[in-house]
Regions:
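Membrane-proximal intracellular helices of multi-pass ion channels
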Residues: 1-430
């Protein structure tokens, strides 16, 4: 309920006087949609962030993003650490679950490390962007500083909101803007436990957990494959990469691939991309980021777990072994459950939006997967959706942020223990 409460407060804040730019008005649905997008760190926008909101409105959005990025339970744990200096057992367990931690004895150290690393990464990205905006583009100090801070938080939170009306299209060939943003998105999508372990054991890969190994391997592999494919497909598209010089095309491909991993920024017009690129982006967005991260999707680890299960089955192996360790049988069921629920969460809203709007399947599916994976990329149809469709997408964003398995677990409330077994039988599959 923490996310729902934060969204409600954010909606009320965005409806207050002084939040909307002069000459513009904010409806309840647009305020609700924007607050949901910010708290869930999605980045889909029904109004232009740069021109619709005043400085106070933009500040409210980025604060909601920071709160959502850290997680409501994590923020509550942080308050307990800094103020009360004590945590209840229930809070420890809940926060440990949010972090996907193996235990909870070191939770307070973990919370401090996560918050410290978050602020450090955001500060480094903000400093790099600030210097670039100030020196190269000649922006005044106030504008450069505010844009740098906003963009850095938006990047690490995998939000994708920007204070430019064309998002990052004006910086498509500037590596000193694109690469810091990519770094922030990648680090934010790795997952807090992975960041902490990499920070502590970066020089000792043999100490890495299976989760860290999966995330590092999967992130690199998906970035390379996604970049290569999108660059190849869009290379001669005059409306996207075709107008750029070769180095800028490679940079644009890497940027696009990174942002489909729940980043949300765009340096080219997504509506002008080819159908093959849309489909590839759908797949990358659906896979998403890492567990216990600010990103969404089924998670990179889930995708790789299913991949290794498939390999083991093809080889006829009874156990699934990954990086020298045997995969738990319970993880098999969890991975399959996550994917099946996620498919349902995508298919049902897609069918509903096709009834509520006149947009083609390709655009609607892209928008729904973007909402579910909390990516925030859009083909440009979100502002033109009817209020009913915006509410549907808002619900999808919330479900995507909470997580399919977490939602299912919350409905069941507790694990059922069955004290008997039925006879075993093998149906024909495939």
């Amino acid at each position: 309920m923490g996310f729902v409460g934060a969204i409600a407060i954010g909606t009320i804040l965005l409806l207050l006087p002084g939040m909307t730019a002069p000459g513009r008005s904010t409806t309840f649905v647009d305020a609700l949609f924007t607050a949901t997008s910010a708290v869930t760190t999605t980045g889909l926008a029904s109004v232009d962030t740069a021109t619709h909101w005043t400085f106070l409105g933009q500040l409210a959005i980025i604060v909601m993003t920071q709160v959502g990025g850290l997680g409501i339970l994590i923020s509550a744990a942080l308050v307990g650490v800094l103020l009360a200096r004590r945590l209840s057992l229930r809070t420890r367990l809940n926060a440990a679950s949010e972090f996907q931690a193996e235990g909870f004895t070191d939770l307070r150290k973990l919370v401090r490390a996560v918050v410290g690393l978050t602020l450090l990464i955001e500060a480094i990205v903000a400093l790099l962007l600030f210097l670039r905006f100030l020196i190269h583009y000649g922006w005044d100090v106030g504008r450069a500083a505010w844009n740098a801070v906003f963009d850095s938080i938006s990047a690490f939170a995998n939000l994708g909101f920007a204070l430019q009306t064309d998002n990052m299209m004006g910086f498509v060939s500037d590596p000193f803007v694109c690469l810091p943003l990519c770094a922030g998105v990648i680090l934010g999508g790795l997952g807090f436990p992975v960041i902490v372990q990499l920070w502590r054991d970066w020089a000792h890969p043999l100490r890495w957990s299976m989760n860290t190994n999966l995330m590092v391997t999967g992130t690199i592999g998906l970035l390379v494959l996604g970049s290569a494919y999108l660059t190849f497909v869009e290379w001669d598209n005059p409306d996207t990469f075709g107008r750029l010089d070769p180095p800028a095309r490679v940079l644009a491909g890497f940027f696009a691939s990174t942002m489909t991993r729940t980043g949300g920024f765009n340096s080219v017009d997504l509506a002008a991309m080819r159908d093959e690129s849309w489909f590839a982006s759908d797949v990358l967005m659906f896979i998403g980021a890492g567990p216990a991260s600010v990103g969404g999707g089924i998670r990179v680890t889930t995708f790789l777990v299913l991949f290794f299960i498939m390999l083991a089955e093809l080889r006829g192996e009874g156990n699934v072994n990954i990086f020298g360790k045997r995969l738990s049988r319970a993880v098999h069921r969890q991975a399959i459950t996550i994917v099946l629920i996620s498919v349902a969460v995508v298919v049902a809203p897609t069918l509903l939006l096709l009834q509520l709007t006149e947009f083609p399947l390709g655009r609607v599916l892209f928008e729904v997967i973007s909402a579910f994976s909390t990516t925030g990329l859009s083909t440009g149809i979100t502002p033109d959706l009817p209020d009913s469709a915006k509410i549907v997408l808002a619900v999808v964003m919330l479900v995507g942020r909470v997580g399919p398995l977490t939602l299912g677990g919350a409905l069941v409330l507790r694990e059922r223990r069955i004290l008997y077994e039925f006879p075993r039988e093998r149906p024909v599959v495939g």
